[in-house]
Design a protein with these regions (language model features):
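Start (N-cap) of specific transmembrane helices in multi-pass transporter permeases
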Residues: 73-93, 171
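Short cytoplasmic-facing helical segments at TM-TM junctions of multi-pass membrane proteins
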Residues: 53-79, 161-164
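Short, small-residue-biased leader/transition segments that mark boundaries at the very start
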Residues: 1-2
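Membrane-interfacial helix-loop-helix connectors in multipass membrane proteins
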Residues: 5-30, 98-140, 144, 148-170, ...
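Hydrophobic alpha-helical transmembrane segments of multi-pass membrane proteins
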Residues: 9, 37-38, 43, 50, ...
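Hydrophobic positions within alpha-helical transmembrane segments of bacterial inner-membrane proteins
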Residues: 40, 44-45, 53, 85, ...
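Final/C-terminal transmembrane alpha-helix of multipass membrane proteins
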Residues: 164, 172-188
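Membrane-embedded translocation segments of transport machinery
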Residues: 14-58
């Protein structure tokens, strides 16, 4: 967000519209970038951990043991992780948005001379609740996608460490790809419903 603020201010300076960098930063961060970058980081960090954990349990035949004692592995291993992701990703998105807007405020202040009060006033004027919710609505869906992809890849692990490494890599790549596609689909959906 720091670089977007700096580059946005640099380009808008040519038109005498530097103050509109606040609108650019606010809308872009809250609507698109905040949730997308958060989901990508979660896919890399937590998605890989979920795949590795479930995959190593599969390698040691612990999942088969769960089935033998009458427990459903999806209910015991997958569902709690999905719930945790659905709670964590929106919370982390809010934190990421706050940090990015704070960084945008600092860059706008030091680089463009936009006072913090002006930044906050412009942010209040240019951002409404629909902008905030446009990003936050995506977060649980992205969390579910990350959790499902990570769990499925973990369940595919064979009996070797090589298989585990391959599935962890596949989990991260597929999760990031699906999250980006999902973000694009949400953007098209929002345009279609004028949200």
């Amino acid at each position: 967000m720091l670089f977007r603020s700096q580059q946005g201010a640099f380009q808008l300076r040519y038109f005498g519209a530097e103050v509109f960098v606040v609108d650019l930063v606010g809308i872009l961060q809250l609507r698109e970038i905040g949730v997308l970058l958060t989901a990508i980081m979660i896919a890399g960090r937590s998605g890989s951990a979920i795949t590795a954990e479930i995959g190593s349990m599969k390698m040691r035949e612990e999942i088969d043991a769960l089935k033998v004692i009458g427990l459903n592995p999806v209910g015991v291993l997958v569902f709690p992780r999905l719930v945790a992701l659905v709670i964590a990703v929106p919370c982390l998105t809010v934190i990421a948005n706050a940090a990015a807007l704070g960084g945008g405020l600092l860059v706008s202040w030091f680089y463009s001379g936009i006072a913090p009060e002006t930044f906050i006033d412009r942010l209040h004027a240019g951002i409404d609740l629909s902008t905030i919710f446009a990003g936050l609505i995506k977060a649980p869906f992205m969390a579910i996608v990350i959790g499902i992809v990570a769990s499925v890849e973990g369940m595919k692990v064979g009996g070797s460490a090589e298989s585990l490494g391959r599935q962890v890599t596949a989990s991260v790549v597929r999760s990031i790809f699906v999250v980006i596609v999902l973000d694009g689909l949400f953007a098209m959906f929002y345009v279609a419903i004028d949200f």
